[in-house]
């Protein structure tokens, strides 16, 4: 009996420390059950051990499976989870096929908004393609105290901010819903002869025009359920996980000039393995062994074959430039792409290489609101902080029914970008990342396998157990 009391004391102490950490005394209702498991044993928790035949066999597996799923749920929620790099947006810092150990403790775990969810799923049950969570109960955002805060140039895992709305047809689920709506709306207005030159409009006229573009695109998608399915929404913690580098902190003013990120007027150090696309002409076929040597993937070569541009690090660019036998010409791709940049509901003249300046919202700080800067901050005010925002025909801004000339933010925001700068869907395209979307910090790469080389030959031994903080 003394052993049981000792076990109970240890488990109870650990559980109470956990409750102090998460600041949730509601969990005290579990204490009597812990006491019963170790001491009183009034509830026959493992009744199936008294049974014979298949019942005992089946229930032993059910018991083990339930225990494993519950353990995984709490470990993933409060301590760490696995994340695999699905795309090339952070190459060549993090590579497609890198498996990351992501710490929830580094920035503090979030109390789940949707606690009733199937472990090991993000939002959809595999095979059956139905929601893996229920939306009740829905808890407000709260973050448990962690070891620190997001720092400049940290690589961060977060929920995709623009993933609040999407269409549930599987072919389009990976598409940015808002970009899709504006793109379709713009095409339809061109076809109907309703397209106008937004550069000649004042901010209020632009607002009305883009409202029409958005409504046209949304109405079209809504009218085509056979093609797009239904328009659905997802709570914050059920949105897709993204991983990018934080290049702008709350309260900083960010501007991109000729591809370089400036913060408060000072150039931020580029990542060592930053990539841009280059226009290149070859004299012959690209040797596979040279591609492997320079870290050029099949995806990179496919892009080159389709468009004549290829993403390269500075090291790879210099090596190819010096290879006169192979390369006829090579130069950085300076094509200015205007479309689909954030904000989608205004014309700014910004490009992916020359963007801003934008002030990154900081909790407790205020900004004067004008029709010119409203498109940049409207989503923060309406969607992320839950306010009702309207603009009347006279151009006056109303927040929650009251005229507003300024706004004080309730959350901190961050600016995230991929190191593969010309091939990354990041804050330049969907805006700020609110603090309640931050998931965790990658600590190290525990496994890495190249999708270009199947089997044993694809294992990247040199990347195993590489600390992410050392990838600058």
Ranges and model annotations:
Residues 1-472:
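Extended hydrophobic leader/signal-anchor segments used for secretion and membrane insertion
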């Amino acid at each position: 009996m003394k052993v049981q009391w000792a076990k109970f004391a240890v488990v109870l102490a650990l559980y109470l420390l956990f409750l102090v950490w998460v600041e949730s005394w509601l969990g005290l209702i579990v204490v009597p059950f812990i006491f019963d498991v170790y001491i009183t044993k009034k509830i026959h928790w493992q009744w199936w051990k008294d049974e014979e035949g298949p019942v005992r066999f089946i229930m032993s597996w059910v018991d083990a499976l339930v225990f494993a799923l519950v353990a995984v749920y709490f470990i993933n929620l409060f301590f760490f989870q696995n994340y695999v790099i699905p795309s090339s947006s952070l190459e060549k810092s993090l590579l497609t096929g890198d498996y990351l150990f992501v710490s929830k403790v580094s920035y503090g775990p979030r109390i789940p908004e949707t606690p009733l969810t199937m472990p090991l799923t993000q939002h959809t049950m595999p095979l059956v393609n139905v929601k893996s969570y229920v939306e009740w109960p829905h808890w407000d955002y709260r973050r448990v105290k962690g070891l620190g805060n997001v720092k400049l140039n940290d690589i961060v895992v977060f929920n995709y901010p623009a993933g609040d709305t999407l269409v549930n047809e599987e072919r389009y689920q990976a598409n940015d819903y808002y970009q899709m709506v504006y793109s379709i709306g713009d095409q339809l207005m061109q076809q109907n002869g309703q397209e106008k030159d937004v550069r000649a409009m004042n901010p209020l006229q632009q607002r009305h025009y883009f409202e029409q573009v958005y409504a046209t695109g949304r109405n079209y998608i809504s009218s085509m359920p056979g093609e797009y399915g239904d328009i659905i929404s997802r709570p914050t913690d059920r949105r897709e996980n993204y991983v990018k580098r934080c290049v702008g902190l709350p309260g900083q003013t960010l501007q991109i000039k000729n591809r370089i990120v400036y913060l408060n007027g000072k150039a931020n150090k580029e990542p060592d393995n930053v990539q841009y696309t280059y226009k290149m002409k070859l004299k012959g076929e690209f040797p596979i062994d040279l591609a492997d040597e320079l870290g050029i993937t099949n995806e990179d070569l496919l892009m080159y074959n389709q468009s004549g541009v290829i993403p390269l690090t500075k090291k790879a660019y210099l090596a190819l430039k010096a290879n006169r036998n192979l390369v006829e010409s090579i130069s950085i791709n300076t094509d200015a792409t205007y479309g689909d940049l954030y904000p989608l509901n205004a014309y700014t003249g910004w490009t992916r290489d020359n963007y801003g300046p934008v002030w990154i919202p900081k909790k407790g700080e205020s900004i004067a609101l004008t029709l010119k800067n409203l498109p940049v901050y409207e989503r923060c005010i309406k969607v992320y902080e839950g306010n009702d925002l309207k603009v009347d025909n006279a151009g006056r801004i109303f927040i929650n029914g009251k005229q507003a000339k300024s706004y004080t933010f309730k959350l901190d925001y961050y600016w995230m970008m991929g190191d593969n700068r010309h091939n990354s869907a990041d804050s330049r395209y969907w805006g700020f990342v609110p603090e309640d979307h931050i998931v965790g910090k990658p600590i190290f790469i525990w496994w890495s396998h190249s999708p270009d080389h199947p089997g044993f030959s694809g294992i990247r031994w040199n990347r195993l157990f590489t600390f992410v903080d050392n990838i600058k």
